[in-house]
Amino acid sequence: MSSYFVNPLFSKYKGGETLEPTYYDCRFPQSVARSHTLVYGHGAAAPGFQHPSHHVQDFFHHGTTGISNPGYQQNPCALACHGDATKFYGYEALPRQPLYGTQQEATLAQYPDCKSSNSTNPGEGQGHLSQNSSPSLMFPWMRPHAPGRRNGRQTYSRYQTLELEKEFLFNPYLTRKRRIEVSHALSLTERQVKIWFQNRRMKWKKENNKDKFPGQRGEAEAEAEEEGNEDGEAEEGEDKETEEKEESKE
């Protein structure tokens, strides 16, 4: 099993080269040596540390499954000797690039308008936003005095209401000529006068439950009086005839 993985490795290295990683060829720095003297003293011997290079070679040559030497111990200064973890097995770390910058440049490349707006000053950007927020198109119904937009309810003054009531009592139906005269006299439009009279007629019908309006009341009374007079005259004539018949019989 081990030979299957070892053979490709030997084809890459020459006979004089070794498979020893580069990070083992380091020396103790002065700070580590100084700490060693403080911990163990000048005359004390440091714990046993054995270079693991021959174990690596034995592993590839003999196919051993692991390091079987019981005397091997991990020294506390091993991390300082080995150096940075990014240089493990001789590989150096690649230079890091800011991810946010690359993503931002990619998005700005797709949308050049955003890039041009970001390059401007903040004050100019705020002005640009305020200009964009305002509507660019003005439709007719958005204007204050648009023809298709409904106006508020018309309020009539006391003088206008009084004059309209007088005109309604005189004649509930106005001709076109009289409507124009009333509208000019009261500073109203012809349509406003027409609507007021329509509403007033409906109100009067609901209050009185009658079909005849106040302007037609005099005519109706006159007709009723005439009918009553005719009936009275007819009754008087009949009474006279009956009296004459009775006298003749006697």
Swiss-Prot record:
GO terms assigned for molecular function: DNA-binding transcription factor activity, RNA polymerase II-specific; RNA polymerase II transcription regulatory region sequence-specific DNA binding
GO cellular component terms attached to this protein's record: nucleus
Compositionally skewed regions (Polar residues) per UniProt: 115-136
UniProt KW Transcription regulation keyword: yes
Highest classification ranks of the organism: Eukaryota, Metazoa, Chordata, Craniata, Vertebrata
Location(s) in or outside the cell: Nucleus
Main location: nucleus
Ranges of Basic and acidic residues composition bias in the record: 206-220
Gene Ontology BP annotations: embryonic pectoral fin morphogenesis; endocrine pancreas development; exocrine pancreas development; regulation of transcription by RNA polymerase II; swimming
Designated name of the protein: Homeobox protein Hox-C8a
Annotated motif Antp-type hexapeptide, positions: 138-143
Gene: hoxc8a
UniProt DNA-binding region: 149-208
Keyword field: Developmental protein, DNA-binding, Homeobox, Nucleus, Transcription, Transcription regulation
Top-level division of the source organism's lineage: Eukaryota
Family assignment from sequence similarity: Belongs to the Antp homeobox family.
Matching SUPFAM superfamilies: Homeodomain-like (SSF46689)
Record field: compositional bias (Acidic residues): 221-241
PANTHER family per record: HOMEOBOX DOMAIN-CONTAINING PROTEIN, HOMEOBOX PROTEIN HOX-C8
